[in-house]
């Protein structure tokens, strides 16, 4: 009798019906070495087509989460006391200026200058953050093309408080081991922070620290008695423009913002402080800036830099989002005929915008910049001799303190009851998705069965699965036992072999070994190709991970796609759903643990990995920025609870305490099995057959 499944291997369905193709009985061609073109900071980007308010609000939520995860700020650190010091007041015509320093994180000091209105009463006044660009002098730059002091003085004279603060490594914001850095070396030391590859495992980065500095700078302004907390704003140029729209993406306290000469569909930022891991795998600066909508925003562009297309590309794209939110009047974009700048012409455009939204001035009001005199550097410097407070941490000790913060956050998430598991999932599922750069639930565009055939009573097919447009196909081999569709509770085992010394058979061959044993127990089997087997570009070069997935992220993404396909079947009688077991052999067991939430149950060969070893997690096949912030391989495993899990070959250094605690806390200890040794194939088959 003909296998009823053969006619149904118009097989796996999720989104689009599988296409059968009458092809020769041969295996699909090997995957190409590169899955897709490598992106970098200059790769042109397109704004996605957004059709509705709801679609944008959902995407904006994803963007905010991605920014926070990439910056190592998910979950948010505790906001410890700032212990702000404001001193050295100088009074001038219509304004005062003071020196400021405070602690965004304990024993790390952020410094700047606070400009306040004089002769306008006690307030409360609007308050504006002023991050600076990569001028040689940082916040103390005062040239024709850009002057932080010029805009801060004029903001104060117009009735607004202004706070200018340093990038890390500039002027007064540094680490004691940097010494008294000369002006010429500011940028060099700025790019020195957290460049050790190990820091990527924690998403500790220059961009993350500066984003947190901006959040805490906003806290500082909000703490001042003469500040109106409902009228907070931010503006900066170039790298300071990046800080502006990054803050706007994650902080709803901003009432207005003005990123200057930075939002572009081409160049996304050329410094480490603008390129956190994973930030632009899916998103561009255009979308990150648009995440502030519907709050008032003005983009300033120049004909002489990468923002030259703002009138035809970036501006209209973001304007469409404001239109979807019925907030067209809250967005404006202008371009001036200059090079890269924040000059007087650009500043006056921002004065008008902030005057409208922060001071409620009429549209016709056009405040002009008044003549100003910047104070001498020595009178604005907070630590002019480079000597920081005695308790300031060195860079290495500060980085270790941030790692300890993440460790404490992970420990605080330990699951102790069912409510704790739910809380863990709500917090950590976004972290899991954005750390691994996966779409969840996985989407499948097309799945084709090629060369469907009968082999010794089993139905076999080579599968070609397309996840998303532009991706290379995922290739797999499939076998089904007789009567699979008449089984009231059919099971399929997805096998991924991470070893190169024992390839599993393809669909043109008679199944043997583990696949045959599974088939003889009435289980369908899908064996996945090893994905991208070529040598990728150096994943550790600056910015690579900002724009591209690592090999590990690609593999986990593919496993989730395959599991989504394997769980849904085409049957003439209607859709059928298979119970999916994901089985990872060798290093693929670790990939399977990260993909565990996409499967009904998981068997993972843990390869006796020493998870505590940074060197082990920096191996090309296991490297994933931020992986330690999701508990490495335990995080994805806990997210799948209470589904059955079998971890074997754990050895002595693979942590499972948090995982065991979670299963025990919800009364599901019987669903979890952890074995130090590697199990034999027959033991794996028995576990799959018995698990419910």
Name each model feature, range by range.
Residues 1-6:
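Positively charged n-region of N-terminal signal peptides that target proteins for export
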Residues 8-19:
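Bacterial N-terminal signal peptides
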Residues 23-110, 120-123, 300-491, 499-524, ...:
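Alpha/beta-hydrolase-fold serine-hydrolase catalytic core, especially in secreted/extracellular enzymes
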Residues 115-117, 131, 165, 235-237, ...:
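Generic beta-strand/beta-sheet core signal
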Residues 121-215, 222-223, 262-273, 487-570, ...:
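Cap/lid segment of the alpha/beta-hydrolase catalytic domain
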Residues 140-147, 184-187, 201-212, 234-245, ...:
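Alpha-helix capping and helix-loop boundary segments enriched in small/acidic/polar residues
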Residues 209, 216-281, 562-632:
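Primarily recognizes the serine-hydrolase "nucleophile elbow" in alpha/beta-hydrolase
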Residues 234-260, 266-274, 278, 282-325, ...:
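Catalytic-domain carbohydrate-binding cleft regions of carbohydrate-active enzymes
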């Amino acid at each position: 009798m003909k296998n009823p499944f053969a006619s149904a291997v118009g097989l796996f369905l999720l989104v689009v019906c599988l296409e059968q193709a009458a092809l020769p009985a041969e295996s699909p061609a090997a995957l190409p070495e590169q899955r897709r073109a490598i992106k970098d900071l200059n790769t042109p980007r397109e704004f996605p087509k957004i059709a509705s308010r709801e679609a944008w609000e959902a995407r904006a939520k994803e963007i905010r989460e991605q920014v926070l995860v990439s910056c190592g700020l998910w979950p948010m650190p505790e906001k410890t006391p700032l212990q702000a010091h404001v001193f050295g007041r100088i009074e001038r015509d219509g304004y005062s200026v003071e020196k400021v320093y405070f602690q965004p994180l304990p024993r790390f000091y952020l410094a700047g200058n606070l400009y306040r209105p004089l002769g306008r009463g006690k307030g409360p006044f609007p308050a504006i953050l002023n991050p600076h660009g990569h001028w040689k002098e940082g916040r103390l730059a005062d040239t024709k093309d850009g002057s932080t002091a010029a805009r801060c003085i004029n903001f104060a004279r117009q009735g607004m408080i202004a706070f200018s603060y340093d990038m890390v490594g500039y002027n007064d914001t540094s680490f004691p081991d940097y010494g008294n850095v000369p002006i010429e070396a500011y940028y060099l030391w700025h790019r020195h922070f957290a460049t050790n590859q190990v820091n990527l495992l924690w998403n500790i980065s220059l961009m993350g620290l500066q984003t947190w500095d901006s959040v805490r700078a906003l806290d500082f302004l909000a703490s001042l008695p003469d500040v109106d907390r409902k009228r907070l704003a931010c503006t900066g140029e170039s790298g300071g423009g990046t800080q502006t729209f990054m803050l706007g993406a994650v902080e709803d306290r901003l009432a207005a913002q003005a990123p200057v000469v930075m939002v572009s569909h081409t160049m996304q930022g050329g410094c480490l402080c603008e390129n956190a891991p994973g930030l632009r795998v899916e998103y561009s600066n255009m979308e990150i800036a648009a995440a502030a909508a519907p709050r008032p925003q003005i983009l300033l562009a120049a004909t002489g830099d990468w923002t030259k297309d703002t009138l035809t590309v970036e501006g209209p794209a973001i304007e469409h989002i404001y239109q979807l939110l019925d907030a067209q009047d809250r967005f404006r974009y202008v371009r001036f005929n200059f090079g890269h700048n924040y000059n007087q012409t650009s500043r006056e455009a921002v004065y008008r915008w902030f005057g409208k939204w922060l001071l409620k001035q009429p549209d016709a009001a056009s405040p002009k910049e008044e003549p100003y005199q910047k104070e001498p550097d020595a009178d604005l410097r907070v630590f002019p001799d480079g000597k920081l407070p005695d308790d300031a941490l060195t860079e290495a000790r500060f980085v270790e303190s941030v790692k300890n913060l993440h460790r404490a956050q992970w420990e605080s998430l330990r699951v102790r009851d069912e409510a704790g598991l739910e809380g863990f999932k709500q917090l950590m599922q976004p972290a899991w998705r954005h750390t691994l750069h996966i779409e969840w639930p996985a989407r499948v565009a097309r799945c084709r069965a090629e060369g469907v055939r009968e082999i010794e009573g089993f139905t076999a097919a080579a599968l070609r699965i397309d996840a998303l447009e532009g991706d290379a196909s995922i290739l797999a081999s499939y076998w089904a036992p007789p009567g699979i569709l008449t089984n009231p509770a059919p099971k399929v085992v997805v096998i991924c072999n991470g070893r190169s010394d024992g390839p599993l058979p393809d669909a043109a061959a008679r199944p043997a070994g583990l696949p045959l044993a599974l088939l003889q127990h009435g289980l369908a089997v899908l064996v996945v190709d090893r994905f991208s087997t070529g040598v990728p570009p150096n994943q550790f070069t600056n910015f690579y991970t900002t724009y591209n997935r690592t090999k590990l992220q690609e593999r986990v993404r593919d496993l989730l796609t395959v599991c989504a396909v394997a769980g849904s079947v085409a049957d003439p009688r209607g859709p059928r759903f298979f119970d999916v077991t994901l089985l990872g052999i060798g290093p693929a067991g670790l990939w399977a643990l990260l993909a565990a939430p996409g499967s009904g149950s998981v068997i993972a060969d843990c390869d006796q990995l020493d998870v505590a070893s940074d060197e082990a997690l920096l191996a090309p096949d296991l490297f994933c920025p931020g992986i330690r912030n999701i508990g490495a391989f335990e995080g994805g495993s806990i997210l799948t609870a209470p589904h059955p899990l079998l971890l074997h070959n754990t050895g002595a250094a693979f942590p499972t305490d948090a995982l065991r605690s979670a299963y025990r806390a919800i009364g599901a200890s019987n669903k979890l099995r952890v074995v130090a040794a590697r199990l034999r194939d027959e033991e794996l088959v028995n576990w799959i057959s018995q698990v419910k």
